[in-house]
Amino acid sequence: MTAQTLYDKLWNSHVVREEEDGTVLLYIDRHLVHEVTSPQAFEGLKMAGRKLWRIDSVVSTADHNTPTGDWDKGIQDPISKLQVDTLDKNIKEFGALAYFPFMDKGQGIVHVMGPEQGATLPGMTVVCGDSHTSTHGAFGALAHGIGTSEVEHTMATQCITAKKSKSMLIAVDGKLKAGVTAKDVALYIIGQIGTAGGTGYAIEFGGEAIRSLSMEGRMTLCNMAIEAGARSGMVAVDQTTIDYVKDKPFAPEGEAWDKAVEYWRTLVSDEGAVFDKEYRFNAEDIEPQVTWGTSPEMVLDISSKVPNPAEETDPVKRSGMERALEYMGLEAGTPLNEIPVDIVFIGSCTNSRVEDLREAAAIAKDRKKAANVQRVLIVPGSGLVKEQAEKEGLDKIFIEAGFEWREPGCSMCLAMNADRLTPGQRCASTSNRNFEGRQGNGGRTHLVSPAMAAAAAVTGRFTDIRMMA
């Protein structure tokens, strides 16, 4: 038998039918649903008189529009409230395997909630009307975002039409240095291959450095695969995967667990499997990263300086750099560690799990928010993350440092709720996109790891965490 990549195995096991042009009907195991991309899909079902094809495939929560403060006041924005209320009504009418409504302890960002509930399992196909669904590939699953029309198709038929991507292996060999996190690895890779480097590919991340990551770290990495242009990112199953999934609410039990684990252990790329493209990086080359521009690929080591567009020979790239520096209010040659920040945001589906909060708390402990920093928002990814963090006393560390301990939600990752930047504010953010206006009109976003964000919060500027004993 021909050696197969992990992507081959996941894809082939879910093909229902293939047309001559390569288009396939792909079966979907898990459908994650939130309030923003589901209303039109549910409305389409109603108009056609259809029901959900498989109620037990749907796991849902409200996240994008939910406020992360003043929960006693409810949702103040009328459009946000309408979307959340509509999700409540639709789930009540159509059903779901599980639903975690606004203010429920299980509620949270869909890409945090799914894995912690065991709704994401190795070998699954996972879709959601959200581009960062690639997060779930960390479990040896085939996961990617879909559009609203595909949300309806999945609800009605349990399938989507798709064409197979090319396969890419990105291996990071060696051991990561102290202070370097999965977020730094993700940003470094994007800086090397560009935001279009993975276009048309499904990326498998491998190598010693990747295998050494926790599941939280792997989720961060796969979350950012979309920012490299890929449709999906994935990591092969190993004992770390299995240990994380065990005893989760929706994980198999007893004999079913034993059979599942036996199968899950096959979810690795075979020896000799051929990828369409491969990259290999040395872990020792990776330093803590900071983005300086308006694309995730505009990223450098913390020890670097803002680049000079005049040194770029490609006129298109040079123009893009000039525009980015103008928007970001930066001058070429400025050391990154001299750039001050106004706001710090630690959260999002990229970095809001308890491991991320522990990293931030380790920096914040016995320190105070810098005087020039206006706000520091700490937003746990779910109610369960919040609960665990409070058990460990992380909330007290943040509050004593002068940070804001918030309720779970997508928060300042995107300007779709009350948490947003104002024009000109510069933010050290653990989110995944630094596009113009992403966090608010005129807001300036720098992507960093949770530890780097916490360091910026207490020093008032971007700071190499390795210099902070």
Curated annotation (Swiss-Prot):
Pfam families the record matches: Aconitase
Listed EC numbers: 4.2.1.33
Cofactor: [4Fe-4S] cluster
InterPro entries in UniProt: 3-IsopropMal_deHydase_lsu, Acnase/IPM_dHydase_lsu_aba_1/3, Acoase/IPM_deHydtase_lsu_aba, Aconitase_4Fe-4S_BS, Aconitase_4Fe-4S_dom, IPM_dehydratase_rel_enz, IPMI_cat
Annotated residues for binding of [4Fe-4S] cluster: 349, 410, 413
Pathway annotation from the record: Amino-acid biosynthesis; L-leucine biosynthesis; L-leucine from 3-methyl-2-oxobutanoate: step 2/4
UniProt GO BP: L-leucine biosynthetic process
Keyword Transferase: no
Enzyme class, spelled out: lyase
The keyword Iron-sulfur belongs to this UniProt entry's keyword annotation: yes
Cofactor note: Binds 1 [4Fe-4S] cluster per subunit.
GO terms assigned for molecular function: 3-isopropylmalate dehydratase activity; 4 iron, 4 sulfur cluster binding; metal ion binding
Taxonomy, superkingdom: Bacteria
Swiss-Prot/TrEMBL keywords: 4Fe-4S, Amino-acid biosynthesis, Branched-chain amino acid biosynthesis, Iron, Iron-sulfur, Leucine biosynthesis, Lyase, Metal-binding
Catalysed reaction equations from the record: (2R,3S)-3-isopropylmalate = (2S)-2-isopropylmalate
Similarity comment: Belongs to the aconitase/IPM isomerase family. LeuC type 1 subfamily.
Subunit composition and interactions: Heterodimer of LeuC and LeuD.
HAMAP family cross-referenced by the UniProt entry: LeuC_type1
Record-linked NCBIfam families: leuC, PRK05478.1, PRK12466.1
Function of the protein: Catalyzes the isomerization between 2-isopropylmalate and 3-isopropylmalate, via the formation of 2-isopropylmaleate.
Name of protein: 3-isopropylmalate dehydratase large subunit
Organism of provenance: Neisseria meningitidis serogroup A / serotype 4A (strain DSM 15465 / Z2491)
Name of the gene: leuC
